[in-house]
């Protein structure tokens, strides 16, 4: 799934079923259907929760009266109590915060206890054993679904036959089911026999029970289900097409004034159980034969090809059945089906198809162009043919994640699949390419070979996140995406992984909330980074052949990381790349089973020519390495380096290993004392590098020469990122780190500037409320002066991709800091657009300049500019344009507009889709004026947010992250801790995000105390 994603129930007696969305307390339409409920379901907590509060009535009750004198005495007593309460609060309140902070007298020096708020034992539900019994496992499914896609009846009826294998004697069949009613009068189990002469024996059922906490449906039998035999389990059920973007859900779009509805599925990680009863664990693969009933004027698609002609649905004259071929063995989370009125385009040979709204289908042509080529490239790369007969990709109006790799049926949000030339930006185009490449890589990593359990999610997402760059590079080589990996993925995840609240790549998870939590940058970007590291230290040929062996050996099965290690080790030993005594498991377990990453400190002996390398976990807590672990983590570190004389920035195979050793010394290196040395060539290793002061000074001297390009572009980016983050963590003097950045006045390449902007964004967010901020602004503008002149405010279609990206970032920072020419250009271009006849059809702003122009004009404008942009958002048919406008609307400095925007974000039919709420809040929280508004909104509207989005969605994760970032005062931290303490246990899949936000806020406060004066003094000296 590309990222880095409530429930319903029913209640009735005998023949009536009333559908109500029970997690929302807003009144919903109800629909009576002919069906019967089980007694178990009518008494469940979910049913009690959906009682309609609007039916409560009030009447006059018996009471008492109070005399005027009594009322006076009562009032006097009340006033006295207020005074006493006020005195108590005055004297006692300051130390009430002891619950949150150990010391209320010395807050700035206190030991923060935010980490203590989060304990696994806090969540009773997470203690539950939510794994299915292993005694009964699925072999095959036959699934039929009839979705009713109409206002007032968003339901679906279903029937499933599951052929199960019994691996040990059992007296029950336990499977998953959630948010649906199962008709227990219809349920039956038969012993299955292939012999046509022998009738299948019926197994007597003694009890059927919904275990709602575990999301289990348990069928108990009087007879023992015998090991080694097969049984057919037959179930009928009714569910609700929800609007929470999970399970089998509904989505809509408008054509003119008409709203059109579709039904789509999103099952990863644990939501197939919301669409049909199933064994919803990734290792429990089975084949699926799917039938979908649909209105005659709509189309259905699923994982496999449709077979035969549509068949009538008895009793539903406007519906027909579509039957699909039986699938290959696959996990439940990869099952998919869609019913829509979309249009389709197909490739030359017809096996690759793209689907979208009829007025957006032409925007899918870029996907249709690159998709088949990337698929073919992967077939050659892995030496394994794509195993399905077709591939569909579908652009959905509402989708929680970026995209989903369903086998043979990739689903995407529109911005991840659609590209409109002349409207969409180069960045949009690259996003489409990387998302499609990512999801196609999953067809092998995740689909063909699936992790045995979600603990090894990284085997899916890490490989897809790395392979996406390789796939895009094959079809768009001029973009240099392999170089971009360092600044887009590696540097991006370093910040998260430097927190104590980070987690191992391979981590034990059980509860669905825990599973959802790890769909994060660790499972995606860190995993991709260590895979890239393997690719380099094993060599590309060994790496590729090892992957092919792994995929062939585990095809249509599930795997654990040890299976991958074994395949790579065998190939590495065969090709003599690794010492026979060393295994990939020895090396890589230190990266997947330990949290964090090391900083390698390089101390040179300039007299002897030797160098000592020391490793220590890198953390952002001002140089401390205190962790919850009693054992200091050590890694197998591949060591690469070059010197000023050698200038070899291509040799990425390690010349030396740190074999989980605290330190090593390299001797007889023949280094010239007056020359610099740089470690971690092309930053292929997942670690930071610090140097002794003299080597840093030698590097700075080189960077300030005309020959600064002697250091490779990637390593220039590395030096900037390492220096500023080492200083942030208290491991390097900020004067040295900022001296490293001074050469940027002559830099024009994208990678170093991107690294600088990423690292300086933190400085910007910390300094913005301080007196020294103006000096920081002046310094950055001085650095930008040359590159601003180089890239200019004019976009050219002939510019290389990295030049375009450099221009976008440079103009964004220049305009943000009030660069006069930049602001004037942006405001003028926006003004011209406003005065253009038919602005929805004629936008004179170059696509790649839109983000800068929109945001700057709205920031320096008022309601007129905001309302104009909002109207353009409502009118545009291009998803990427909507995305740009949503972000730009958060740039305003008008507080009331931001407050209204926040409210619209959680208002039905406001025009903002649920999937885009994170985008809105992120934009507002990125605005210095909007950040406190965003956090207050999170605090004050928490219950409303939970009702609107639910706690298990990726959306809530994004909202929590955005609203709580940038906190750097003890008072704001106190508010954050109070909010967290008040709602502990309610964060669901956002629990880890909240924990990380608290830790980051604590680190920010320490940073301000430790570095404010040093940075202020340096800026004074360098901006005079």
What are these model-derived regions, one by one?
Residues 22, 262, 324, 351-626, ...:
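Hydrophobic alpha-helical and helix-loop surface patches within well-folded domains
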Residues 490-491, 527, 612, 629, ...:
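Long, ordered, helix-rich scaffold segments
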Residues 183-190, 301, 581-585, 595-680:
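Beta-strand-rich binding/interaction modules
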Residues 165-181, 289-295, 621-640:
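Surface-exposed beta-strand/loop patches in extracellular or lumenal glycoproteins
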Residues 128-134, 227, 234-289, 340-348, ...:
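Glycine/proline-rich low-complexity spacer/linker segments in large multi-domain proteins
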Residues 158, 265-270, 277-437, 466, ...:
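Hydrophobic helix-coil surface modules that form long, contiguous segments used
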Residues 2-5, 15-22, 26-159, 257-262, ...:
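N-terminal, polar/Ser/Thr-rich
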Residues 181-254, 316, 664-671:
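A surface-exposed beta-strand-loop module
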């Amino acid at each position: 799934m590309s990222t880095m994603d409530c429930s319903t129930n029913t209640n009735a007696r005998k023949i009536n079923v009333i559908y109500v969305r029970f997690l929302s307390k807003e009144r919903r339409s109800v629909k009576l259907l002919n069906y019967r409920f089980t007694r178990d379901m009518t008494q469940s907590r979910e049913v009690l929760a959906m009682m309609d509060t609007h039916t409560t009535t009030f009447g006059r009750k018996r009471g008492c009266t109070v005399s005027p004198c009594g009322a006076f005495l009562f009032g006097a007593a009340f006033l006295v109590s207020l005074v006493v309460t006020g005195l108590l609060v005055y004297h006692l309140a300051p130390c009430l915060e002891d619950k949150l902070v150990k010391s209320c007298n010395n807050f700035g020096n206190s030991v923060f206890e935010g980490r203590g708020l989060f304990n696994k034992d806090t969540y009773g539900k997470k203690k539950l054993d939510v794994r299915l019994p292993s005694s009964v496992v699925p072999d095959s499914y036959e699934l039929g679904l009839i979705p009713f896609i109409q206002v007032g009846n968003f339901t679906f009826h279903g029937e499933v036959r599951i052929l199960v294998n019994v691996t040990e004697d059992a007296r029950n069949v336990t499977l998953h089911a959630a948010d649906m009613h199962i008709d227990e009068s219809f349920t039956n189990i038969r012993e299955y026999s292939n012999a046509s002469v022998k009738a299948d024996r019926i197994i007597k059922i003694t009890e059927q029970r919904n275990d709602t906490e575990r999301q289990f449906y348990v069928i108990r039998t009087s007879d023992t289900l015998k090991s080694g035999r097969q049984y057919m389990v037959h179930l009928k059920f009714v569910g609700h097409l929800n609007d929470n973007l999970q399970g089998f859900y509904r989505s809509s779009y408008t054509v003119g004034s008409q709203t059109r509805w579709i039904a789509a599925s999103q099952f990863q990680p644990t939501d197939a159980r919301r669409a049909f009863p199933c064994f919803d664990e990734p290792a429990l693969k089975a084949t699926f034969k799917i039938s979908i009933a649909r209105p005659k004027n709509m189309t259905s698609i699923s994982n496999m090809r449709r077979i035969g002609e549509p068949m009538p649905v008895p009793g539903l004259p406007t519906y027909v059945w579509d039957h699909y071929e039986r699938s290959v063995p696959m996990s439940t989370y990869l099952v998919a089906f869609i019913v829509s009125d979309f249009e389709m385009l197909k490739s030359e040979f017809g096996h690759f198809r793209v689907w979208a709204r009829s007025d957006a289908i032409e925007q899918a042509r870029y996907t249709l162009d690159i998709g088949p080529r990337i698929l073919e490239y992967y077939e050659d790369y892995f030496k394994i043919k794509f195993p399905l007969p077709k591939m569909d990709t579908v652009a959905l109006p509402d989708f929680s994640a970026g995209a989903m790799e369903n086998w043979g049926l990739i689903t995407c949000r529109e911005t991840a699949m659609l590209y409109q030339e002349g409207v969409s930006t180069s960045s949009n185009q690259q996003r489409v390419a990387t998302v499609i490449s990512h999801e196609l890589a999953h067809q092998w990593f995740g689909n063909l070979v699936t992790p045995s359990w979600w603990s090894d999610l990284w085997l899916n997402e890490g490989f897809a996140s790395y392979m996406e760059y390789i796939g895009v590079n094959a079809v768009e080589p001029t973009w240099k995406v392999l170089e971009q990996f360092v600044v887009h993925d590696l540097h991006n995840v370093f910040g998260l992984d430097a927190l104590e609240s980070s987690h191992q790549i391979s981590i034990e998870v059980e509860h669905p909330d825990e599973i959802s939590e790890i769909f994060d940058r660790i499972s995606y970007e860190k995993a991709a980074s260590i895979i890239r590291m393997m690719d380099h230290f094993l060599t590309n040929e060994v790496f590729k052949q090892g992957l092919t062996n792994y995929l062939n050996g585990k095809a249509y099965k599930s795997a654990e990381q040890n299976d991958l290690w074994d395949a790579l080790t065998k190939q590495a030993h065969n090709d003599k790349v690794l010492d026979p005594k060393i295994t990939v498991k020895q090396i890589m377990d230190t990266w997947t089973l330990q949290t964090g990453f090391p900083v390698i400190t390089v101390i040179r002996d300039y007299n002897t020519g030797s160098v000592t390398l020391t490793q220590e976990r890198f953390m952002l807590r001002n140089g401390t390495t205190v962790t919850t672990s009693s054992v200091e983590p050590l890694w197998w570190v591949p060591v690469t380096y070059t010197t000023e004389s050698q200038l070899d920035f291509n040799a990425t195979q390690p010349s030396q290993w740190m074999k989980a050793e605290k330190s090593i010394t390299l001797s007889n290196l023949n280094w010239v004392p007056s020359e610099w040395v740089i470690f971690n060539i092309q930053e292929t290793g997942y670690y930071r590098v610090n140097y002794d002061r003299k080597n840093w000074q030698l590097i700075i001297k080189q960077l300030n020469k005309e020959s600064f390009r002697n250091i490779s572009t990637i390593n220039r980016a590395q030096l900037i990122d390492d220096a500023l983050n080492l200083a942030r963590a208290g491991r390097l003097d900020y004067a040295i780190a900022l001296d490293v950045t001074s050469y940027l006045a002559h830099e024009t390449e994208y990678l170093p500037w991107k690294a600088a902007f990423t690292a300086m964004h933190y400085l910007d967010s910390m300094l913005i409320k301080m007196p020294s901020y103006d000096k920081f602004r002046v310094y950055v503008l001085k650095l930008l002066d040359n590159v601003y002149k180089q890239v200019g405010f004019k976009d050219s279609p002939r510019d290389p991709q990295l030049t375009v990206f450099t221009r976008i970032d440079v103009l964004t920072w220049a305009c943000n800091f009030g660069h006069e020419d930049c602001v004037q250009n942006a405001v003028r271009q926006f003004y011209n657009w406003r005065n253009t006849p038919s602005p929805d059809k004629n936008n004179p702003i170059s696509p790649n300049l839109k983000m800068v122009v929109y945001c700057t004009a709205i920031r320096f404008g008022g309601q007129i500019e905001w309302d104009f942009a909002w109207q353009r958002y409502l009118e545009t048919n291009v998803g990427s344009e909507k995305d740009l406008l949503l972000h730009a609307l958060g740039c305003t400095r008008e507080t009331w507009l931001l407050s209204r925007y926040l409210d619209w974000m959680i208002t039905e039919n406001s025009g903002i889709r649920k999937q885009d709420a994170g985008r809105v809040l992120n934009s507002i929280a990125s605005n210095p004026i909007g950040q406190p508004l965003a956090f207050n909104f999170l605090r004050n509207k928490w219950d409303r947010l939970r009702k609107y989005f639910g706690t298990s969605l990726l959306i809530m994760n994004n909202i929590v992250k955005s609203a709580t970032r940038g906190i750097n005062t003890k008072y704001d931290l106190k508010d954050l801790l109070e909010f967290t303490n008040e709602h502990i246990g309610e964060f669901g899949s956002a629990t880890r995000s909240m924990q990380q936000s608290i830790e980051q806020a604590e680190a920010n406060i320490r940073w301000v105390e430790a570095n404010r004066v040093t940075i202020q003094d340096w800026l004074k000296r360098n901006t005079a």
